[in-house]
Design a protein with these regions (language model features):
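C-terminal transmembrane module of polytopic alpha-helical membrane proteins
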Residues: 1-23, 34, 167-269
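N-terminal TM1-TM2 helical hairpin plus the immediately adjacent luminal interfacial "cap"
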Residues: 10-131, 190-199
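Membrane-embedded alpha-helical segments of multi-pass membrane proteins
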Residues: 78, 132-141, 198-205
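Membrane-interfacial alpha-helical segments at the cytosolic side of multi-pass membrane proteins
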Residues: 81-91, 102-107, 140-150, 205-215
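Short, well-ordered alpha-helical segments in soluble proteins
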Residues: 122, 141-153, 182-189, 209
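A cytosolic-side transmembrane-helix exit/cap motif
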Residues: 122-127, 153-159, 216-229
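Membrane-interface micro-motifs in multi-pass membrane enzymes
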Residues: 126-154, 168-172
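A contiguous binding-surface segment within folded domains or other stable secondary-structure elements
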Residues: 162-166
Length: 269
């Protein structure tokens, strides 16, 4: 019988270490999410920041950038923060702080919003408001799992009973869509906070497009970013800054991680 020590245990020290090592842009975006939750206690601020289709056309273009930061309550906010943090931290560690900041305050917010507005206004002719960072979670999951599907095309589910003749396999790239459907069902049953099926699907479309490389041109040129980083000495001046040139500096400006005989993977340090 396995001992208690063999099971994963919560460690406050490891959690504290993980939080203290979060890269800069991840910290900033999560801080803005929390700040919007505090400000959202006011109904006026909620209305100002939501993505409301007809309000956008009426001059509220800021809404296509503000809606991912806004949440309907504490449970909605904290659950999205917990789910978003590892995905956002990984993205920033792979692409750099400046690229992450530009994409998440720009195209990764505005492109899903534009798709949502087009469908709401011209196809369904509705005016349903949406808000929440779950659109970023779906976007990042879609891009990550699409990339993972190249090396692991299927995710194998364990047999619910040993007498079943075969295992069940799900296409790895389809998992975000399955999660979208499940969260929508659970939301309708009032088990989860309110979610937008259409909004999540718009986030998935942009995530898949990024994973396929169709919209990689949205990322700023690395040559320009290197010039800015070198000119301002961002890596040396700003704590937790991640350089865009990962091959040279590695994560947080240290040597690149390696799986070679003489190297130790960063995640095991």
């Amino acid at each position: 019988m396995p001992s208690a020590a063999s099971f994963p245990q919560f460690s406050p020290q490891r959690l504290r270490s993980y939080v203290l090592r979060l890269p800069l842009c991840t910290r900033l975006l999560l801080l803005v999410v929390v700040a919007f939750w505090v400000a959202g206690i006011s109904n006026g601020f909620q209305h100002w920041a939501q993505l409301i289709p007809k309000e956008v056309l009426g001059g509220g273009m800021h809404r296509i950038n503000t809606y991912p930061f806004l949440h309907v309550g504490f449970i909605h906010m904290i659950s999205n923060v917990i789910a978003l943090t590892p995905l956002l931290e990984r993205f920033e560690s792979e692409h750099g702080t400046l690229t992450t900041l530009i994409l998440f305050t720009g195209p990764f917010s505005t492109f899903p919003a534009a798709l949502y507005l087009l469908l709401q206004l011209f196809l369904f002719r509705l005016n349903t408001p949406i808000e929440g960072a779950s659109i970023w979670i779906i976007l990042l999951l879609s891009a990550t799992l699409l990339h993972s599907s190249k090396s692991q095309p299927y995710y194998t589910l364990p047999d619910p009973a040993s007498f079943l003749p075969r295992t069940y396999r799900l296409p790895t790239a389809s998992i975000p869509l399955i999660l979208i459907i499940l969260t929508s069902i659970l939301s309708n049953l009032h088990i989860l906070p309110p979610t937008s099926l259409l909004g999540h699907l718009c986030g998935a479309v942009v995530g898949y497009a990024w994973g396929l490389g169709w919209i990689r041109f949205l990322a700023p040129p690395e040559k320009v970013l290197r010039w800015v980083e070198g000119k301002l000495n961002l890596l040396g001046r700003i704590p937790h800054y991640v350089s865009v040139d990962q091959k040279v500096y590695g994560r947080y400006g240290v040597l690149p991680q390696t799986n070679g005989v003489n190297g130790v993977p960063l995640q095991n340090v």
